[in-house]
Swiss-Prot record:
Name the record gives this protein: N-succinylarginine dihydrolase
Pathway(s) it belongs to: Amino-acid degradation; L-arginine degradation via AST pathway; L-glutamate and succinate from L-arginine: step 2/5
Catalytic activity, EC: 3.5.3.23
Residues annotated to bind substrate: 19-28, 110, 137-138, 213, 251, 364
Pfam family, one: AstB
Sequence similarity: Belongs to the succinylarginine dihydrolase family.
Key word Zinc present: no
Catalytic residues as annotated in Swiss-Prot or TrEMBL: E174, H249, C370
Assembly description: Homodimer.
InterPro entries (UniProt xref): AstB_sf, SuccinylArg_d-Hdrlase_AstB
Reactions performed catalytically: N(2)-succinyl-L-arginine + 2 H2O + 2 H(+) = N(2)-succinyl-L-ornithine + 2 NH4(+) + CO2
One example GO MF annotation: N-succinylarginine dihydrolase activity
Length: 446
């Protein structure tokens, strides 16, 4: 059956701010305590969605999670009415209020790992929400993620939405940011590629400066859950030195699509063995792997991290050609810009480069790839998604005006203590559930 890759982007939430919560994420740390612009952030992401939808790509949207999380703050011992809880947290532990207020669920590449029905043993699309247990502000996301995915992908004949793995360091799971899929065509069986930073029960190299967030054990558990064929599943370790350079997820150093792997030469441990394994596995599935390896001499790891060259979307057009979606920071880095010009002018599979202004997300360490969750759907599966989440002219206009009505254009760290922000966010999200037709998705609606 014909299938298409859909991208479900996270809509940036009303509490988007720069709290520097993500150790190992250089941009996040560098912009700590800056004032953010939630309205601009949401509009930048929405305009990327709309332009890609206009180009014929299947583009969906995922709603923000409720923030600040009063559930977390109450769990941490702050009590009283909602306004009292926020006031106490702001006074006694502002770092915990910042964690409870993070809009990080916007980066849906970390929402879950997704395996299409062509790859799974029961012929359904499988989702495993990521536990994101390495960071408090992200570890609180998986329950709401599961609720959202279960709402959008509700038909059990087509979809299986699992619980997150147990939130322990041995099973640290960061979702699709460390996973990609190679195939001849989206609707045919493919190769699922899992990248991890360390193994809990195997000796091997590990980073020394920043933590490795994804474990081999978590990746293997997800593959087993999804019923993936062993011969069609490949595991690779990310080079610990690039993790220490700020590559906190694999999607900061490589991206894959169909038969193409676009990667930096320093991305992996034992890279040639990985290329050979992927080539053999994909050959058995009827396709030939095309590796585009960017040399350190052309683009350094530091260039890759500051420009987010590899935190890009690699998309296939109907004619089989591929387009690379990059942030504008790639055009502002001389080495990266020169490389992209050469890439687009060459004879390889990537013929075009699209550039987007995602500055607000980028300042927190999230480029085009961070903002989207890839879900391959055949025609019957797409028809089973009945919520109003597919971007078109009407939905774009509704969301754009919704942002204008509800979002602030400035949010500084001290503004998180404003109890009005909670009410503003709830009012906005309550209206959003009606626009997207997702029912009572949030705790405050129940």
């Amino acid at each position: 059956m014909n299938a298409q890759e859909a991208n479900f982007d996270g809509l940036v939430g009303p509490t988007h701010n720069y709290a520097g919560l993500s150790f190992g994420n250089v941009a996040s740390l560098n912009n700590e305590k800056s004032a953010a612009n939630p309205k601009a952030a949401a509009k930048q992401g929405l305009r990327k969605m709309k332009q890609l939808a206009d180009l014929g790509f299947a583009q969906g949207v995922l709603p923000p999670q409720e923030r600040p999380s009063l559930r977390l703050l109450r769990e941490l011992g702050f009590s009283g009415k909602d306004a009292d809880v926020i006031a106490k947290a702001a006074k006694q532990a502002p770092e915990l209020l910042a964690a409870a207020s993070s809009a990080s669920a916007m980066w849906t590449a970390n929402a879950a790992t997704v395996s299409p029905s062509a790859d799974t043993s029961d012929g359904r699309v499988h989702f495993t929400p990521a536990n994101l247990c390495s960071k408090l502000h992200r570890a609180i996301e998986h329950e709401a993620t599961r609720r959202t995915l279960s709402t959008l992908f509700a038909d059990p004949a087509h979809f299986a939405v699992h619980e997150a793995l147990t939130g322990t360091p041995a099973l640290g799971d960061e979702g699709a940011a460390n996973h990609t899929r190679f195939c001849a065509e989206y609707g045919k069986p493919g190769i699922e590629f899992f990248v991890y930073g360390r193994a809990e029960y195997r000796r091997g190299p590990e980073p020394k400066r920043f933590p490795a967030r994804q474990t081999f054990e978590a990746s293997r558990a997800v593959a087993h859950r999804h019923g993936l064929a062993e011969e069609a599943t490949v595991y690779a370790q990310q080079d610990p030195d690039v993790i220490d350079a700020g590559v906190f997820h694999n999607d900061v150093i490589s991206v894959g699509n169909r038969d193409t792997l676009f990667t930096h030469e320093r991305a992996f441990v034992n890279k040639q063995a990985i290329y050979d394994t992927l080539t053999a596995a994909l050959d058995a599935r009827g396709a030939r792997l095309n590796v585009i390896e960017v040399p350190e001499a052309a683009v350094s790891v530091n260039d890759a991290v500051t420009s987010y060259l590899f935190n890009s979307q690699l998309l296939s057009r109907a004619d089989g050609s591929q387009v690379l979606v990059v942030p504008q920071e790639c055009r502002e880095n001389g080495n990266v810009a020169a490389y992209l010009d050469e890439l687009a002018a060459g004879n390889g599979p990537i013929h075009d480069v699209l550039v987007f202004d995602l500055r607000e997300s980028m300042k927190n360490g999230g480029g085009p790839a961070c903002l989207r969750l890839r879900v391959v759907l055949n025609e019957a599966e797409r028809a089973a998604v009945t919520s109003n989440v597919w971007i078109n002219d009407t939905l774009f206009t509704s969301l754009d005006t919704w942002i204008d009505r509800h979002y602030r254009d400035r949010l500084a760290p001290e503004d998180l203590a404003d109890p009005a922000l909670l009410e503003e966010s709830r009012t906005a999200l309550d209206e959003l559930t009606q626009i997207l037709r997702v029912g009572s998705l949030y705790d405050f609606q129940r």
